[in-house]
Regions:
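Long, contiguous hydrophobic alpha-helical segments, chiefly transmembrane helices and signal peptides
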Residues: 20, 26, 58, 76-77, ...
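Flexible, active-site-adjacent loop/turn segments at secondary-structure boundaries
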Residues: 13, 25, 137
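Active-site mouth loops of central-metabolism enzymes
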Residues: 37-61, 107, 111-113, 181
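Active-site core of metal-dependent hydrolases
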Residues: 30, 76-182
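Metal-cofactor-binding active-site regions of metalloenzymes
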Residues: 16-50
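Short, solvent-exposed turn/loop segments enriched in Gly/Ser/Thr/Pro and often Arg
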Residues: 1-2, 26-27, 160-162
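Metal-associated gating/positioning segment near the N- to mid-region
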Residues: 1-14, 30-41, 96, 128
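Alpha-helical scaffold segments that flank or form the walls of functional sites
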Residues: 1-16, 49-74, 103
């Protein structure tokens, strides 16, 4: 993991840099956000995300990244509108998979981060005690109430830059406003 190498080099004074937390590769499910595996490419480790199938697979992946020395584990609970078949309103992981990730991360005193745009994925993150939620884009009154009840322990990162770019600068790449708004 390059993140770990860079963080260690900064901390050891080998290169100048800010305080830096090394993150895992994104953990996803087959067909979810970050799954870029293709049947003709035999190297799944080159995919943007690591695929898991079930709680034990999740546990294995999380342990592997923690062994490598990451500071945080990122899991993708929902999709995104620019991902065919995995739009923003989805919630991909089972509660057992999320619980396994949270248990392993908390046991080792690390952070867990989630990509959660759909209300179901935001609620799932909150139910499992996840403190750092990226996006939280599509919500409702119930979800907002849950977030407010947890306001002293959660941090929401809306990721405004990507939303702006999707709406205003992505058409040349085939992402129309209709696709971007879901």
């Amino acid at each position: 993991r390059l993140d770990v190498v860079i963080r260690n080099a900064i901390n050891n004074g080998q290169i100048p840099g800010p305080r830096y937390l090394a993150a895992s590769q994104e953990i996803t499910v087959p067909g979810g956000l970050g799954d870029e595996t293709l049947p003709h490419l035999p190297f799944p480790e080159f995919s943007f995300g690591v695929n898991v199938n079930g709680a034990e697979d999740m546990r294995k992946s999380v342990r592997m990244f923690l062994k490598y020395g990451v500071d945080s584990i990122k899991i993708n609970l929902s999709g995104d509108n620019f991902v065919p078949g995995a739009d923003s309103h989805t919630a991909w992981m089972t509660d057992a998979e999320v619980a396994a990730a949270v248990e392993e991360v908390k046991m080792r005193g690390k952070r867990i981060i989630v990509h959660a745009r759909s209300k179901a994925s935001i609620q799932q993150a909150l139910r499992h005690g996840i403190e750092l939620i990226y996006h939280a884009s599509f919500t409702d009154t119930e979800t907002l109430d849950m977030m407010e009840a947890a306001k002293d322990r959660i941090f929401v990162v809306p990721g405004i830059g990507i939303l702006y770019a999707l709406l205003n600068e992505s058409e040349q790449w085939g992402i129309t406003r209709e696709i971007a708004t879901g």
